[in-house]
């Protein structure tokens, strides 16, 4: 199966899961509506009538027809979530490129949040008292604008906007793999209880903030709507005390905000639960005539670079497979092909993993070279060692020079030139052309002028450490892959009868150790740049743990696997330190 066909097959599998997530999102709307009606129509003295009346309302024809707009908005919300999960993650070096690539998608997603919040509030207000149900109501024999309805519709849109800003505006959608394996029913039950309980607390801030804003601008909005609809003004919520003293309205707004926040959180987590389930990947394809041609191999899943979720699932599957002791699936990695007696399974898997590790390390190294602190440390010239300088004085001068270069402090006296400038071979000093000097000065002046324009640097300059942050945020496949390789290498001592892994041990150790050295360099400046410390710590600990597992298993053979030098000494020190 080619790379494109593997990608399409994986996308088709994930698309089916996204469809099930949409159906779950639609079903949860009626469950949340039932919970809302149970709160609103609470009757302590008549519990049976309270429950039966609520269920009768949910099952009525009015509910089914009135919920059609909300269901349509939920489907739109789910389609956008599916598109974000299955799309390629591109690096945008500047904020302008980010706006071009992600801006339209974010605006559409914000519109979906506002639409779901508005339609949820519109549907729920239809079950409240007459003053809350419609935008217009009869007051003193005339049509008046309902300030209560305006308040609830506005708080629905505010809740949707609040969830988008706090969760989706600057962050990309990602899935999390559970540490403890649970069934889907157990995950759904825990998610439902936790979401409903958490939403009651998280809805306090948006409710209070919206109420404060409505006290200031609510009468103006109601006055404007009354002119548009040609109705009279509603004066029930005039002033601060008119809003604050209406306890029932505040309770409805708080409950509605909690319902909307829990609804959006549940829809997002449904995708995370279903998409984090294992893909049906195989180590080797069966060669029988009746074998399925659509079987996706583990190597093909790791090679799907344009869908981040697929690569994460393949790496996680490889990690779980490597942890299964004495399993037939893990034994397939060490098997030879028939006919031919070649380690085709291990060869393709090892080459794919080393290719991913090598490309990730190279990109990380290139991105770290753009960080000014690391660049200054690498380009710092070493002072000329003389006999009169002691070791402590040398160290003090190096630290002083690093400090001055970091903060841009120049020496008062220009340094003396101890080394004579080498003259050209022909003895003639060549000066640069005056046209070249003028053009260079004009270019530098133009750059300085453009940088003074407000917003130019912010939009069109690449932030320091942005590429490094992007790589670390998308390093989950590398985290699982390094640990899986370490487990397979450690298990090969007992389970590899043909020794197919031992030939590639030096390359695996060097690749992981190279990544470890780069992460150690980055750890020295992690506090000075905007890098997610959680993703960095996860990657660094996984790499160190993987390298330690391999070195501990082959500690007696490190001298045979690696040539003598600095790398061998580092690995021996790692085993001794741990």
Swiss-Prot record:
GO cellular component, one term: nuclear pore
Topology in the lipid bilayer: Multi-pass membrane protein
Keywords, comma-separated and alphabetical: Membrane, mRNA transport, Nuclear pore complex, Nucleus, Phosphoprotein, Protein transport, Translocation, Transmembrane, Transmembrane helix, Transport
Protein name: Nucleoporin Ndc1
InterPro entries assigned to the protein according to its UniProt record, in alphabetical order: Nucleoporin_prot_Ndc1/Nup
Ranges in the topological domain labelled Cytoplasmic: 1-21, 82-106, 166-200, 261-578
Modified-residue entries (Phosphoserine), positions: 414
Segments crossing the lipid bilayer: 22-42, 61-81, 107-127, 145-165, 201-221, 240-260
Similarity annotation: Belongs to the NDC1 family.
Gene: Ndc1
Physiological role: Component of the nuclear pore complex (NPC), which plays a key role in de novo assembly and insertion of NPC in the nuclear envelope.
Protein's organism: Drosophila melanogaster (Fruit fly)
One example of a Gene Ontology biological process annotation: protein transport
Location (main, coarse): nucleus
One family name in Pfam for this protein: Ndc1_Nup
Perinuclear space-side positions: 43-60, 128-144, 222-239
MF annotations from Gene Ontology: protein-macromolecule adaptor activity; structural constituent of nuclear pore
Subcellular location: Nucleus, Nuclear pore complex; Nucleus membrane
């Amino acid at each position: 199966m080619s790379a494109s066909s593997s990608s399409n097959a994986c996308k088709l599998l994930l698309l089916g899961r996204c469809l099930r997530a949409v159906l779950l999102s639609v079903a949860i709307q009626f469950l949340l509506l039932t919970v809302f009606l149970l709160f609103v129509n609470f009757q302590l003295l008549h519990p049976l009538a309270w429950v039966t009346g609520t269920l009768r309302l949910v099952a009525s024809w009015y509910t089914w027809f009135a919920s059609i707009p909300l269901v349509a908005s939920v489907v739109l919300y789910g389609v956008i979530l599916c598109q974000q999960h299955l799309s390629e993650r591109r690096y945008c070096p500047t904020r302008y490129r980010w706006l071009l690539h992600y801006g339209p998608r974010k605006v559409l997603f914000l519109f979906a949040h506002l639409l779901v919040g508005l339609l949820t509030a519109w549907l729920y207000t239809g079950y409240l008292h007459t003053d809350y149900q419609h935008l217009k109501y009869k007051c003193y024999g005339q049509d008046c604008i309902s300030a209560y309805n305006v308040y609830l519709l506005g708080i629905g849109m505010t809740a949707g906007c609040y969830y988008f800003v706090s969760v989706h505006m600057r962050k990309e959608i990602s899935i999390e793999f559970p540490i403890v394996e649970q069934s889907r029913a157990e995950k759904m039950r825990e998610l439902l209880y936790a979401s409903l309980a958490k939403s009651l607390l998280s809805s306090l801030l948006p409710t209070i903030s919206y109420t404060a804003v409505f006290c200031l601008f609510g009468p103006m909005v109601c006055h404007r709507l009354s002119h548009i609809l040609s109705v009279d003004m509603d004066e029930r919520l005039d002033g601060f005390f008119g809003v604050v003293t209406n306890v029932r309205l505040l309770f409805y707004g708080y409950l509605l905000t909690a319902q909307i926040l829990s609804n959006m959180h549940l829809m997002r987590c449904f995708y995370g639960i279903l998409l984090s389930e294992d893909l049906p990947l195989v180590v080797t394809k069966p060669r029988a005539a009746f074998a399925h041609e659509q079987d996706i191999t583990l190597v093909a899943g790791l090679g799907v670079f344009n869908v981040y979720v697929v690569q994460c699932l393949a790496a996680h599957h490889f990690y779980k497979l490597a942890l299964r002791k004495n399993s037939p699936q893990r034994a397939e990695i060490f098997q030879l092909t028939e006919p031919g007696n070649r380690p085709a399974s291990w060869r393709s898997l090892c080459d794919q993993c080393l290719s991913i590790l090598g490309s990730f390390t190279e990109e990380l190294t290139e991105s770290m070279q753009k960080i000014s602190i690391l660049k200054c440390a690498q380009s710092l010239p070493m002072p000329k060692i003389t006999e009169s300088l002691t070791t402590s004085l040398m160290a003090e001068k190096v630290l002083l020079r690093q400090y001055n270069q970091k903060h841009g402090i120049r020496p008062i006296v220009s340094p003396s030139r101890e080394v004579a400038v080498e003259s050209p071979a022909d003895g003639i000093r060549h000066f640069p052309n005056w046209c070249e000097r003028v053009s260079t000065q004009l270019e530098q002046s133009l750059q300085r002028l453009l940088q003074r324009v407000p917003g130019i640097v912010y939009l069109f300059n690449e932030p320091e450490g942005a590429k490094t942050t992007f790589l670390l945020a998308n390093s989950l496949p590398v985290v699982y892959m390094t640990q899986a390789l370490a487990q397979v290498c450690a298990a090969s001592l007992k389970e590899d009868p043909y020794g197919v892994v031992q030939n590639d041990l030096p390359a695996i150790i060097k690749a992981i150790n190279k990544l470890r050295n780069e992460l150690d360099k980055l750890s020295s400046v992690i506090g000075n740049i905007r890098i997610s410390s959680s993703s960095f710590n996860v990657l660094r600990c996984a790499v160190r743990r993987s390298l330690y597992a391999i070195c501990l298993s082959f500690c007696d053979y490190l001298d045979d696997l690696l040539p003598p030098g600095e790398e061998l000494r580092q690995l021996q020190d790692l085993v001794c330190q741990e």
